[in-house]
Amino acid sequence: HGSQWGIIDPVDTPDGGNIGLHKHMAMSCEITTGYSMIPIIELLRDSFNMKLLDESSIQDIKFLTKVFINGTWSGLIEQPNVIYNKLKLYKMTAIIPIYTSISWNIRKNFIEIYTDGGRLTRPLFTVSNKIPSYNSKALLDKSKINWEDLVTGFLTKPDNFNIRNNLVYTISSLYGKNKKDQLIDNKAIIEYVDSSEANTYMISTYLDDIKKQTTHIEIHPSLIFGILTNQIMFPENQPAVRNAYGCGQAKQGVSLYNSNFNNRIDKMGVILNYPQIPIVKSRYVKYITNEEQANGENPIVAIMCHT
């Protein structure tokens, strides 16, 4: 389903009665922790003059843009395009938490904002005027970067800044004075997107697929898969049934998954006595376990022609 694209592994699911019910997250998927909606309401009131419902007339309700926060109709705003773009800029510069979901339904004339926890989200490169964000001058000018810079922007932040704190800042409290004009040029190149936002975006898989309307591009096509699917060699050349079967069998070839397995209360655990490091492997083996956890065995097969 489109709402699960890039978030749930489309291959790694069991066959039989549990098909589609037992799911695995994709490689880059993250679960949000959530924060209170009150700071967002205060931001909309103070900076964007959002009207609460008890302050609005019938004409306002009919013509102004509705704002829903965590599913609650919280107010009405004018100039939704300006406010939407400003909120997205705040998200891409960590003034509001980077896991905040902001989507604008133009046809139905409402903006949805989600701050709650438990949402599945994933990172994507942004695209502007058919140019991917990884061509950003702020990125190219940096001699050293880290993941925090890629998702929160390149302006210098306080030492106590942490993206996991989910705090709402002002521009001056986070970056100091006279930094407002530098936000656009130094914003993040990667945005965390959930299903609600993805419904309003046009996401390309490859660089050649970018069109005028494209808003985002995948970091890498393999990130739509989970850990086990990315261990399969050339999954695009095999039937989907065999890929799903391979994911199920790979779990039984894992070596010592935990040193205290005798004391755990797992429902099931399969341990291979003599595991080996695969001779043929994908790049993800290096990233997942640094090739320090063997799994499976390398069979030796002799083939002879007999007539």
Describe each region flagged by the PLM.
Residues H1-T307:
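Conduit-forming functional cores of very large proteins
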